[in-house]
Amino acid sequence: MKRIVVLGAGESGAGAAVLAKVKGFDTFVSDMSAIKDKYKTLLDGHGIAWEEGRHTEEQILSADEVVKSPGIPNDAPLILRLREQGTPIISEIEFAGRYTDAKMICITGSNGKTTTTSLIYHIFKSAGLNVGLAGNIGKSLALQVAEEKHDYYVIELSSFQLDNMYNFRADIAVLMNITPDHLDRYDHCMQNYINAKFRITQNQTSEDAFIFWNDDPIIKRELDKHGIRAHLYPFSAIKEEGSIAYVEDHEVVITEPIAFNMEQEQLALTGQHNLYNSLAAGISANLAGITKEDIRKALSDFQGVEHRLEKVARVRGIDFINDSKATNVNSCWYALQSMTTKTVLILGGKDKGNDYTEIEELVREKCSALVYLGLHNEKLHEFFDRLGLPVAEVQTGMKDAVEAAYKLAKKGETVLLSPCCASFDLFKSYEDRGEQFKKYVREL
């Protein structure tokens, strides 16, 4: 009997283990951290052996194949041992893809992928399609393949997930943009990160679709290097050569495969960055054969994504906005660009090799003060202190950061949490960071 070992027992790992068990494999799960009770219950319910707080090497090195959590680096010692002995290491998405014939709509990019994924799912669901939401958001793809059997899956893919995908094929691949992110996981080499993102197009054929932002200089430069066989669907902010979707005379226009248009002001999502998200989602729905009426309705009634430019409250004339999902500099750039008032910016956390020059001009123009929130703020001091803005440093947690920002902000201004960094120095996740921000804002 083939032995499958799953490393990591979060949403993706637990789901992969259930699918492996359902398919009749000898299955073992190992997590170096504590496993959440809900995943223990799931594993126990399927009779799957597991361990937590350690990796027992003899159990793991005996695997015929390993399904690895995207959070485990490829250069972790145990992963290197497995590679040395020739054990195949794959992602949960790769594993799940073997056991379904459903259409796969896959979205990646440095920014905008969660909003775009959620919007595509909303359009498909609203149109009455049998669709699942998976990847970085929603339920484990493997668990859904084991238990639910959808006709379509809309999947948000990080570069880490793409790294361990080999035969998986996206029917529709969407690449929103590429800006520096996670370079600490890619030997601080931008080309390695770019190559990971373009893996979303591997295995595509001329029957498949590749949707991408035509204004992204890196994507345009790299297109010819990757032997893309899929039909190309480029989109841009304005009508330009090659683009099949754009805005013209305040109308969203999609020219292929079926002509589509709607008034830009009817879009539920506002701001330039959200225009790109809406264009990519509109093309995806168009390719899936969803009616123009259903696409228009869903693009106009979408509710947005939590922790992404989420309006929290107005306290004594000061607006508070939660953009905790901004874990890189480019995300913060989009957030600052959308600000219409002077802004107190809360930033900081686990730096991933950030270059803050990208937001320097916007910080000068838009910000009235800065709050550094993190255990190690030396890089922020080094870059931003010279701008001469009032600065508060907080190393204790979100409560003190919110109070510091509130004191610095004036009536009519905005406090924006848009950290540019990962959350893992003081918080469990970007969701935890955002929830704490909202909690302490409401306690002001």
Swiss-Prot record:
EC nos: 6.3.2.9
Entries under Pfam families matching the protein: Mur_ligase_C, Mur_ligase_M, MurD-like_N, MurD_N
GO molecular function ontology, one term from the record: UDP-N-acetylmuramoylalanine-D-glutamate ligase activity
Catalytic reaction(s) noted: UDP-N-acetyl-alpha-D-muramoyl-L-alanine + D-glutamate + ATP = UDP-N-acetyl-alpha-D-muramoyl-L-alanyl-D-glutamate + ADP + phosphate + H(+)
Pathway where this protein functions: Cell wall biogenesis; peptidoglycan biosynthesis
UniProt keywords, alphabetically: ATP-binding, Cell cycle, Cell division, Cell shape, Cell wall biogenesis/degradation, Cytoplasm, Ligase, Nucleotide-binding, Peptidoglycan synthesis
Any one Gene Ontology cellular component term annotated for this protein: cytoplasm
Chief site of localization: cytoplasm
Keyword Membrane in record: no
Cell compartments where the protein resides: Cytoplasm
Source domain of life: Bacteria
Residues the record lists as binding ATP: 109-115
A Gene Ontology biological process term: cell division
PANTHER family in alphabetical order: UDP-N-ACETYLMURAMOYLALANINE--D-GLUTAMATE LIGASE (PTHR43692:SF1)
Family: Belongs to the MurCDEF family.
Its biological purpose: Cell wall formation. Catalyzes the addition of glutamate to the nucleotide precursor UDP-N-acetylmuramoyl-L-alanine (UMA).
Protein known as: UDP-N-acetylmuramoylalanine--D-glutamate ligase
Gene behind this protein: murD
